[in-house]
Amino acid sequence: MEVISTNTNGSTIFKNGAIPMNGHQSGTSKHLNGYQNGTSKHQNGHHNGTSEHRNGHQNGISEHQNGHQNGTSEQQNGTISHDNGNELLGNSNSIKLGWFSEFSALWPGEAFSLKVEKLLFQGKSDYQDVMLFESATYGKVLTLDGAIQHTENGGFPYTEMIVHLPLGSIPNPKKVLIIGGGIGFTLFEMLRYPTIEKIDIVEIDDVVVDVSRKSFPYLAANFNDPRVTLVLGDGAAFVKAAQAGYYDAIIVDSSDPIGPAKDLFERPFFEAVAKALRPGGVVCTQAESIWLHMHIIKQIIANCRQVFKGSVNYAWTTVPTYPTGVIGYMLCSTEGPEVDFKNPINPIDKETTQVKSKLAPLKFYNSDIHKAAFILPSFARSMIES
């Protein structure tokens, strides 16, 4: 493994010596708080983040839910804008009476709670509050700024689908970029593919990586794979600085497209992603819940259709610890060899194919679920196709 971090002025130094633009800290995860691009899903003002999964806008563990507003979104020149309705409903990163609860203006009128068996870690990085606890039902739970990023025994549907939907749709993936993924679940799934030669992981928050090394050693061990380069820095800037046509696939395990995180879902970022992909290359990014955010999903699709000249598709799956129990994905390809996302050509679940692994069996993904992920409820289909 090669680890690349940032220099004294805060900019990231890559292997080729390029120093990316300051400001948008892109990151690494799908959920975290506010780091615009990948690693956090909440609103700290750092573009991207570090966590591996999910939604969450700042929310907290507060017991009160006063006066939250649900902002509407508009699209202007490819941007996703909201009013000030995404404020946190409580910013207390603590456990109340043995329960962790997550409130957010992103899902007003509802909350999600888990019984806490043991607090394993609580601290503050340069970017966010980080907490890890043992839950009664889902094993270890990682939260960032009060938002659940991943659960050990409930997050595997998200991870398996964000990796195998795109990589199962192209032959012989070799070079892959992960924006986010500092815990290591996404990397774990990616290493099932023996054809892969190079994996770059961009994580903004070194504390998240440290938590992985201490609490998920079986995941952190994969950072030592000689094919892996771990970059502690800005994911959006990394993509902009990437060599044109270099990657076969890019996985964007990003934060929500609201507040500072919205840059990861707008045209300039998608244009940088498309440039970094080879002809017929693929990208998969998280794309919210059809039960809460259809207006956001429509804007993301509109942006992607303007940039990606291959195919643009929306898929979804179930994740028990995410709001409404579901999460969506955008899957797009660049112009070149045709990519049919709905019919996997490289199905990792088939022992008879070239894709074999010594890892534990898949818990969620299979070829049938791959195909079914693109079948949408009538209300969602009509809105997306309109």
Swiss-Prot record:
Biased composition (Polar residues): 1-14, 23-48, 57-87
Keyword match Endoplasmic reticulum: no
Keyword Methyltransferase assigned: yes
Record-linked CDD domains: AdoMet_MTases
Record-annotated active site: 253 (proton acceptor)
SUPFAM superfamilies membership: S-adenosyl-L-methionine-dependent methyltransferases
Region (Disordered), start-end ranges: 1-87
Superkingdom assignment: Eukaryota
EC number: 2.1.1.53
GO CC entries: cytosol
Entry comment describing in which tissues the protein is expressed: Predominantly expressed in roots.
Broad class of enzyme this protein falls into: transferase
Record's keyword terms, sorted: Alkaloid metabolism, Methyltransferase, Polyamine biosynthesis, Putrescine biosynthesis, S-adenosyl-L-methionine, Transferase
GO molecular function terms listed in the Swiss-Prot or TrEMBL record: putrescine N-methyltransferase activity; spermidine synthase activity
Phenotype reported upon loss of the gene: Plants suppressed for PMT1, PMT2, PMT3 and PMT4 exhibit strongly reduced nicotine levels but accumulate polyamines in roots, and have an impaired leaf maturation phenotype at harvest.
Induction of the gene: Accumulates upon the removal of flower heads and young leaves. Triggered by jasmonic acid (MeJA).
Boundaries of every PABS domain copy: 97-334
One Pfam family here: Spermine_synt_N
GO biological process: alkaloid metabolic process; methylation; nicotine biosynthetic process; putrescine biosynthetic process; response to jasmonic acid; spermidine biosynthetic process
Record-stated family: Belongs to the class I-like SAM-binding methyltransferase superfamily. Putrescine methyltransferase family.
Function (record text): Involved in the biosynthesis of pyridine alkaloid natural products, leading mainly to the production of anabasine, anatabine, nicotine and nornicotine, effective deterrents against herbivores with antiparasitic and pesticide properties (neurotoxins); nornicotine serves as the precursor in the synthesis of the carcinogen compound N'-nitrosonornicotine (NNN). Methyltransferase that mediates the conversion of putrescine to N-methylputrescine. Promotes leaves ripening.
Name the UniProt record assigns to this protein: Putrescine N-methyltransferase 4
UniProt organism field: Nicotiana tabacum (Common tobacco)
Gene: PMT4
